Amino acid sequence: MGKIIGIDLGTTNSCVAVMEGGKPVVIPNSEGKMTTPSIVAFVGSERKIGDPAKRQAITNPTKTIFSIKRFMGESYDKVQNEINRIPYKVTRGGNDTSRVDIDGRLYSPQEISAMILQKMKKTAEDYLGQEVTEAVITVPAYFGDSQRQATIEAGEIAGLKVKRIINEPTAAALAYGLEKADKDMKIAVFDLGGGTFDISILELGSGVFEVLSTNGDTHLGGDDFDHVIIDFLADEFQRNEGLDLRKDAMAMQRLKEAAEKAKIELSSSTSTEINLPYIMPVDGMPKHLIVTLTRSKFEQLSDKLIRSTVDPCEKALKGAGLTAKDINEIILVGGSTRIPIIQTEVEKIFGKVPSKGVNPDEVVAVGAAIQGAILSGDSNLGEMVLLDVTPLSLGIETMGSVMTKLIEANSTIPIKKSETFTTAADNQPSVEIHVLQGERPLAKDNKTIGKFHLDGIMPAPRGIPQIEVTFDIDANGVVSVSAKDKATGKEQSIRIEASSGLSEAEIKRMKEEATANAEADTKAKERVDKLNHADSVIFQTEKQLKDFGDKIPADKKASIEATLTKLKEAHKAQDLSSIDTIIAEINNTFQAMSQELYNAKAQTNNSAGNNNSAGNNTQNNNNASDNNNNNVTDVDFEEVK
């Protein structure tokens, strides 16, 4: 049975882990790093993913895609704030979805995420030495149904069967509690990542990890902290120079990179200098941006964001029926929890210093790997049980446009619940089931996750027909809803899959394209590797020709130089089919020549050895003669020719 890998599909960075011998292992990528930037770049016909994509972002801002997680499963109208912040083009797709426009080719957020997942999949396969087809993928605890479904679709497009969707704070708690499964404790997981914020309250005991409540904000994270710095720098430059950097995509990409770097530096320093030379030319003269940003100024700029974390924490405690004093440990997850003022705020909320015993960048992937091992029946983990919750209430629209809840927020999943409703008018032949997710009393203020009709209701006065509506949430938090007329037995159901905006046919097409692109990426890498190898052979051959010099016979040297010229021409033309043949020809010629040189040297050494033997005999005779000529004086002389 193949391994089930754990993937933390993050807004800013992603990470992959696997269980080996009962221990979680975070797998380094091809660049040797434990985390991979969640960035995809389109460069001509090639795609770059991760660090290579990040390195070229400044010079290719409109085709470098980052923070795609913020668009997953969201309607186009809801992501306008995000669209205003990014340099790449996002347009409206079908079913009010978002699409990334790259030279007229429209990509869904799921497709972009799938490219990142493919990178994670390949990283795991290179490490394990075998194909990987199954994964546990993490999502923010406060992700809604459409966002979870979009994540499952991204996995499917990437060629992965998603065995389980697990909430990020829950995954972190699994990783934290792996060595503490026998202890009874209540923990709070404060997860502030690149684009989302979650707070979950869990109870651990006897190998059971039970989520008591969760809360959060799917549009609050490190990106927002970066953006307050970006706004500050752009405003400073406009105040000093009268120019708006926001109109220049390349300048904004440089500001983004500088803001992220400054934010990180301010976690360990009280001030940092942001120095961006040649940020914008004005009348042919270069303008530079040099600003000193202090930690206190950054905290002032971020004050609203910091305060935004307080209310979800208080709601999570209330939802769990606990107070801050009941919490034994606070776990910090996500790179943004390294910000000192965030740690101070967490200490204020819970009245105790948060634990720093886990790596905030890797712990979620580790937890996902543990969940994968649990699902595969890993005997090393004993009897570990995970009980998660649904983050938001679910219900339907009823008379008066109100939302009637069937499943309350923080209900343990999987869960199934039914309730009976009736008609609002006499002889009503059908009813529309409008499925909603959220906490507001009016239907219009909550999120629509699906609609369907139940037809064929027998004519009857208002209030007589009995319509049984059933909600079923699986372990991934994905919703199915059914409606049944008790009188006729007629039933209609819907699995909320289309809420992410993709049909089965679209997913199939995207999966086929992803497979084809993966093959194209492999071929592109092989092409680059072959050209690099040819370049290396050219360099080494020229070096050896120079080192051997006159030792190489003239005819052999001319032959090698002619073949070398052919290789240079093939390299320039990128004639991959010829390169291997020419390199083999050079290697064979050099091998034969090296053998000849070796044989010639060996023969020379043998001749020298024979001469030395003769010389020794002569020396012995001379010594005897010297004994008879003691009056002869030995002198050194140099023969002049």
Swiss-Prot record:
Q: Which InterPro entries match?
A: ATPase_NBD, Chaperone_DnaK, Heat_shock_70_CS, HSP70_C_sf, HSP70_peptide-bd_sf, Hsp_70_fam
The induction comment states:
By stress conditions e.g. heat shock.
| Region of interest: Disordered | 604-641
Where composition is biased (Low complexity), the residues are: 604-634
Tell me which residues bear Phosphothreonine. T196
Task: Name a Pfam family for this protein.
Answer: HSP70
Any one Gene Ontology molecular-function term assigned to this protein's record: ATP binding
Which UniProt keywords are given for this protein, alphabetically ordered?
ATP-binding, Chaperone, Nucleotide-binding, Phosphoprotein, Stress response
Q: Which PROSITE patterns match?
A: HSP70_1 (PS00297), HSP70_2 (PS00329), HSP70_3 (PS01036)
The UniProt record lists the keyword Aminoacyl-tRNA synthetase: no
Q: Which family does the UniProt entry place this protein in? A: Belongs to the heat shock protein 70 family.
Q: Its function?
A: Acts as a chaperone.
Protein name (record) = Chaperone protein DnaK
